[in-house]
């Protein structure tokens, strides 16, 4: 590509040696304005019909948006009809302003006011393109000609609003602001401000769009800080952002521009919009949320937001989309899973109000997601992830050494199959390998213990097992049922076995609850685990020993 690179030139920087935005932080939410129904809609392959628009409109109200751009009513009958529906039947709350877009053309402005008749404090958003490129190639006008278009529109709009009895709000956008020389953008905006004469009770929105993202986010922030310093009547202005995402940094540009002094953001849910999209307001809002700032829009049911978005836009959200994608709260990596597992346990024990879990910048429950899919198992997964799934989904608290042992078994399966293993498959494999053992040679049946009169402090264990289906009676000595039973089994099999580690826990609550026992057994050649589940904890332990013995026999027979 080196030869093609000569076609392009670097974007000019802004000379602000005393810029202040790099030392600031976002401490409050901006005014949010959704443009899903206008900018988002015009970018769709199949634009929304009335039902899809209405569902999106009501979702935006539910989420708490106070300013919603509902369309371009002078451009199509569909948008005009929807604007009238919003005004007459949309049940718009008193604190929500409908916003409509209009070009700086008299006949379109007239039609726009017809669409808004009866609306409560609507926003008339008028614009014209001011960039050097469009002045030269599209309009063939100089700066004065472009400025006059904006000034004439501002006069007509304010006059019509006065004749209609007032109650209107105004917004002006120098479209393609990022392609406009700053002094030109300032001259045109100040001319509009002079006409509109904003007041503390009716501030003018000056919207400075990154219609095409052309530079790094810091440059946009510099442009916004420069404009905020130089705009006339700044105290009676609301400086608004409208970033696009052509370079993939729309969110970063918006965040830095808020630091630079902007008050308001126009964007869409999940960033739908022309070309690579508008700024994603859900991601922006949740970025603030994870920094302890209330975003003032409700993202607590992100699955519902996703559902309406996908229905209304007929677009699917990617699996890795921040905060909402199917896989964003999921870890496959073994080291990540282990850290998450330990972090979740530490959080439960500490009961600390601050969320601190490795690899999870947000508590999934805060956006209506669950912990169930945080850890999923494939060939990259480790013992911590497998242990987490068994504990969270099935209440099994595997000892660490058993986690290591079972992970090797799961690793073999995922290496062969080359795909993710669902939670139930992992659980079924554990039960089959360590508890039920359908191919196991031995089965525990029953046992009795009584004092050993010849050896003080010891007990004799008399047990029944089956060996390939035949009842066998075995007997051993030890300081308790577990010790005595493994002694009996060792003599019966002719294999010296001993218990290295033992743990147990209940699986449910109540006096008749089942319990699971984990027994690590050593034998000449290694160590292996077994597990048993029974309402009698001693029986569960003896079943676990039989399970371990079956696995020892498999090893010696070359089956494992």
Swiss-Prot record:
**Family annotation (PROSITE patterns):** AIPM_HOMOCIT_SYNTH_1, AIPM_HOMOCIT_SYNTH_2, PYR_CT
Q: Which Pfam families does the UniProt record give?
A: HMGL-like, IPMS_D2, LeuA_dimer
Would the keyword Phosphoprotein turn up in this protein's UniProt record? no
Q: Locate the residues binding Mg(2+).
A: 39, 242, 244, 278
Q: Where is this chain's protein located in or outside the cell?
A: Cytoplasm
Query: Which UniProt key words apply to this protein?
Result: Amino-acid biosynthesis, Branched-chain amino acid biosynthesis, Cytoplasm, Leucine biosynthesis, Magnesium, Metal-binding, Transferase
Disulfide-bond pairs as recorded = none
Instruction: Specify the superkingdom.
Output: Bacteria
**What are the BP-aspect GO terms?**
L-leucine biosynthetic process
The protein's matches in SUPFAM superfamilies, at most eight in alphabetical order, are given as: 2-isopropylmalate synthase LeuA, allosteric (dimerisation) domain (SSF110921), Aldolase (SSF51569), post-HMGL domain-like (SSF89000)
The reaction(s) catalysed by this protein are: 3-methyl-2-oxobutanoate + acetyl-CoA + H2O = (2S)-2-isopropylmalate + CoA + H(+)
Q: What pathway does the annotation place this protein in?
A: Amino-acid biosynthesis; L-leucine biosynthesis; L-leucine from 3-methyl-2-oxobutanoate: step 1/4
EC code(s) of this entry: 2.3.3.13
Q: Region annotation Regulatory domain: residue ranges?
A: 437-560
Q: Which GO terms describe its molecular function?
A: 2-isopropylmalate synthase activity; acetyl-CoA C-acetyltransferase activity; magnesium ion binding
> Which cofactors does this protein require?
Mg(2+)
Entry-linked Gene3D superfamilies: 3.30.160.270, Aldolase class I
- Where is it chiefly localized? cytoplasm
- Which NCBIfam families does this UniProt record tie to the protein? leuA_yeast (TIGR00970), PRK03739.1 (NF002991)
**How is the quaternary structure described?**
Homodimer.
> What does this chain do?
Catalyzes the condensation of the acetyl group of acetyl-CoA with 3-methyl-2-oxobutanoate (2-ketoisovalerate) to form 3-carboxy-3-hydroxy-4-methylpentanoate (2-isopropylmalate).
Which family does this protein fall into? Answer: Belongs to the alpha-IPM synthase/homocitrate synthase family. LeuA type 2 subfamily.
The molecule here is called: 2-isopropylmalate synthase
Q: Which gene encodes it?
A: leuA
